Amino acid sequence: RPNLGNPIPLVKETLLKLYENHPGLQIASVTTTGYGEELVKNAFHCDRGLVETVAHFTAAKHFLPDVDFIIDIGGQDMKCFKIEDGAISNIFLNEACSSGCGSFLQTFAQALGYNVKEFAALGLFADKPVDLGSRCTVFMNSSVKQAQKDGASIENISAGLSISVVKNALYKVIRASSPEELGRNIVVQGGTFYNEAVLRAFEKEMGVN
């Protein structure tokens, strides 16, 4: 959920729900990470903060010890980590443009009259995803409008945008010449991958499932 520049109320709401759903719960220790790391840590007197890259790697390694590559796509940015010999060997970040991130999809969903969850679900029913390339939001907007004029369905536009997100990550941020360069054991993270159409587009591009 967007925090509108102030994550404190959202964190408070989440904690209250946690206690409500688990009466008697006692939290032994709390670590914060991400953009609001210090702010949230100080506001809620958390035990410590952890650099975001270390948090991503630690979580990925916990669930997949032999992880080769981590892709994190959030609302505003994208981070990718190459793992070699059990350590991060390279980090790839997207440029200032938020094209290919969660806010990118949300912008188009709202412009077309949907919330992002509905818009993502429609993409799973595409029969001919629109080829929108992997350009920035401004140019992509004109491509979407042209696709609408050409009679493309919302399903095919949604799927096309999801494919653009994936291709932007693989071929512009990581600059891979082929999906195989990422390795065999890949972990995806970040809220954008809750978009089932993006996850499916990634699986298809990687040649799995």
Stretch-by-stretch model annotation:
Residues R1-P9, E13-K17, N90-I91, E95-C97:
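Short glycine-rich, Thr/Ser-proximal phosphate-binding strand/loop in the N-terminal lobe
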Residues P2-L4, Y19-T53, K82, S89-N90:
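Short beta-strand-loop/turn "lid" adjacent to the catalytic site in phosphate-handling enzymes
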Residues T14-A28, A169-G183:
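Phosphate/pyrophosphate-binding loops at sites that engage ATP/ADP/AMP, CoA/4′-phosphopantetheine
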Residues I27-T31, D66-I71:
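Short glycine-aspartate micro-motif
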Residues Y35-G36, S164, S177-E205:
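Glycine-rich phosphate-binding loops at beta-strand->alpha-helix junctions
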Residues V67-E84:
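Gly/Thr-rich phosphate-binding beta-strand-loop-beta motif of the actin/hexokinase/Hsp70
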Residues D85-K128:
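Glycine-rich phosphate-binding loop plus the immediately following alpha-helix
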Residues S142-Y171:
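Adenine-nucleotide phosphate-binding core of ATP-dependent small-molecule kinases
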